[in-house]
Amino acid sequence: MNIPPEQSAEPNAAVSRTGLSPLQETRMSVCSNRWYSVCFQRPSFYEDGLFFYPQRESGENSKKRGLNMNNMTEIRWHGRGGQGAKTASLLLADAAFLSGKYVQSFPEYGPERSGAPITAYNRISEQRCPIHSNIYEPDYVVVVDETLLESVDVTAGLKPDGAIVINSAKPAEQLRPLLRGYPGRVFTIDAGAISHKHLGAYFPNTPMLAAIVAVSRCVEPEDFLRDMESSYRHKFANKPQVVQGNLDCLAEAMREVKE
């Protein structure tokens, strides 16, 4: 549905071609630690990382406008190169953006090679976020590769009332000794088995994406599944079996994630 010019964010803005709400059509800054550009509509695919929200605003200005940072959810992803943690972070941002939220998604790399540890981040908020930094005290942590528990302090800064979601076939209590005394909630899901079952290969990022949505409720599950179906049908237009496999992955992961 097109938005009439008089409802646009700018007086002389062009008519929308994306069918998004007026909030989503607001002029957005798209930036990352490597690129900065400006876009006026949602892109189909992403660069390395994006911040989606209207024009930048300082923390002092946000206080004057009464912005409540308690409405913000911060998520940190831990994985290895090639496992899709960065892609999952971007897809989560896409789904949250389409539900009318302000979002950030960006990665942090070490050595850029397959199998090397990487970190990715999400901020999801009901209001614009003036923060432009890594996330040091996340509400949620997603661990895409269980072996990282032995070498990386994945719970660093994780809020005690938050949660960690780990890709593992082991029960949560068996993994607690590796979490360096973290007292909060621990969820596990065998993302590898789920992806092998529905996709015939090891793609843990798809089940882990669904698991963090189920645990955090940063996006309504129904909205999330609807947006993901639309994205998959666009990306894999000539591969209906791949679309259905991914959708089955998401649905089973949301059911099977356990505390």
Regions found by a protein language model. Name each.
Residues 1, 5, 17, 66-68, ...:
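Polar/charged alpha-helical tracts
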Residues 68-259:
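Active-site cofactor/cluster-binding pocket
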Residues 14, 18, 36-53, 65-66:
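Positively charged N-terminal leader segments that act as targeting/secretion signals
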Residues 24, 48, 62-63, 87, ...:
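Enrichment for repetitive, rod-forming helical segments
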Residues 1-30, 34-38:
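Cationic, amphipathic, low-complexity alpha-helical segments enriched
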Residues 30-31, 40-41, 47-48, 72, ...:
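Alpha-helical structural elements
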